């Protein structure tokens, strides 16, 4: 049984290839420019208080270096993977203290959004390698970015290809329809059928108007007929916050902790 405690910090990480729209997605998710353009290869954390359905929620957004084309990005992958592990290790260390810090704040990563460019018809070898590294260490939700460039047929096909690969390579992704992880019955509305989520981010100057402008017209990022951002935003900022937090604590962390205590080697 999941025990819910309100106002715990919720941490979302974005990872994926360069130019896949990670920073723009975060800004569109929040509705204003929070994450700036990256000019380095480090991991950036943005901490904020956000009104989520009338509750002020403490949220951390983590923007990571993008994987590149034409060069070995294994070091970047290891950096991100080690960051996720480090947060789990810090929690183990705090939990093992005789006198715990009453003000200690959980920094574990509760959700990893993995961005797949719409120009890819499927997961590339680098995507598969990374996802296999972090599978079981964090709740993974795959996302197809800049999906407004795809036809309806292409959207269906790329989703099918990605899901087949996820199953083939035994990559563990978060079960959005598990009744233990959402806060209201209405939230469990076959969200797994939307995975990977098709998202479109607003133009930099249009975060508040929630649109992407083209010569032929506008794409509303809040229109479910245009993309899956409305459903993804609702689960991230409302219905699945505590489910993602609790699953991290009760399943991911406990499995990791058991492996560490038994001397197991993590991937």
UniProtKB/Swiss-Prot annotation:
G3 motif: annotated span: 63-66
Pfam families xrefs: Septin (PF00735)
Keyword Nucleotide-binding: yes
GO molecular function annotations of the record: GTP binding
Domain of life: Eukaryota
Segments for region (G1 motif): 16-23
Gene Ontology CC annotation, any one: septin cytoskeleton
Residue span, Septin-type G domain: 6-263
GO biological process: cell division
Keywords: Cell cycle, Cell division, GTP-binding, Nucleotide-binding
Coiled coil: none
Region of interest: G4 motif: 145-148
Amino-acid positions noted as binding GTP in the UniProt annotation, renumbered to this chain: 16-23, 66, 146-154, 212
Function: Septins are GTPases involved in cytokinesis. The septins localize to the site of cleavage and act as a structural scaffold that recruits different components involved in diverse processes at specific stages during the cell cycle. Septins are also involved in cell morphogenesis, chitin deposition, cell cycle regulation, cell compartmentalization and spore wall formation.
Assembly: Component of the septin complex.
PANTHER family: SEPTIN
Family of the protein in this entry: Belongs to the TRAFAC class TrmE-Era-EngA-EngB-Septin-like GTPase superfamily. Septin GTPase family.
Name by which UniProt lists this protein: Cell division control protein 11
């Amino acid at each position: 049984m999941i025990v819910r405690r309100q106002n715990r910090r919720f941490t979302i990480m974005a990872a994926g290839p360069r130019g896949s729209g990670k920073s723009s997605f975060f800004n569109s998710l929040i509705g204003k420019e929070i994450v700036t353009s990256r000019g380095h290869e480090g991991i950036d954390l943005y901490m904020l208080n956000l009104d989520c359905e009338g509750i002020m929620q403490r949220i951390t957004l983590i923007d990571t270096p993008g994987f590149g084309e034409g060069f070995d990005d294994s070091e970047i992958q290891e950096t991100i993977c080690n960051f996720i592990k480090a947060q789990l290790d810090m929690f183990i260390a705090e939990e093992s203290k005789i006198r715990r810090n009453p003000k200690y704040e959980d920094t574990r990563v509760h959700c990893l959004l993995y961005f797949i460019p719409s120009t890819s018809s499927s997961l590339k070898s680098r995507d598969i390698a990374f996802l296999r590294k972090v599978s079981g260490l964090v709740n993974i939700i795959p996302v197809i970015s800049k999906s407004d460039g795809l036809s309806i047929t292409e959207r269906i096909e790329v989703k099918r290809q990605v899901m087949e690969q996820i199953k083939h390579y035994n990559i563990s992704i978060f079960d959005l329809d598990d009744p233990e992880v959402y806060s209201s019955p209405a939230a469990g509305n076959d969200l797994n059928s939307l995975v990977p989520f098709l998202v479109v981010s607003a133009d930099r100057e249009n975060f508040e108007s929630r649109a992407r402008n083209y010569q032929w017209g506008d794409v509303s990022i809040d229109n479910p007929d245009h993309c899956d951002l409305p459903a993804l935003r609702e689960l991230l900022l409302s219905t699945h916050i505590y489910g993602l937090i609790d699953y991290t604590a009760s399943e991911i962390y406990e499995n990791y902790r058991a492996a560490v205590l038994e001397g197991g080697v993590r991937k």
